Amino acid sequence: TAEALVSHPNVNASYNPETKEMTYHSDVNIAIAVDTPKGLLTPVIHKAQDMTLPQIAQQIAELADKARNNKLKPNDLTGATFTVTNIGSEGAMLDTPILVPPQAGILGTAAIEKRPVVVNENGQDAIAIRQMCYLPFTYDHQVVDGADAGRFITTIKDRLQTADFQADLEV
């Protein structure tokens, strides 16, 4: 998501309706939704654009642990420019994430399930079983046009489909 936000700066932006000013953020600060016994908290991964995938994974684990153990500090909860919520952690396939103003967008990650899909193998259509995941994206239409939203999601989809996450995570 950090890579996609760098590639699509209007999604990593905010709009102030009082001043009618748009702010394009140079830092990608991603809030992650964490389910805790006291309710949902959204700690922030600051400057995610400068982190490797293993560093981001480590930050997610650390922030989630701090959130669940009531150890977050005020700085851990401020400065988000975008939010990611994992609706799939409870098995949900679809949801409509609610935008957190002044952020321009929030991305949901649904449950990953095997699905039959049509693939092209050697010029022939075939049915294959693939891991599939819906990525519901809610955005502020004052900041992000529908076509831009589509390009942003396509960037994420392409990264998910072509990445070697085992190598990226050094597994």
Residues covered by each model-derived region:
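C-terminal catalytic/motor cores of large multi-domain enzyme assemblies
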Residues: 1-171
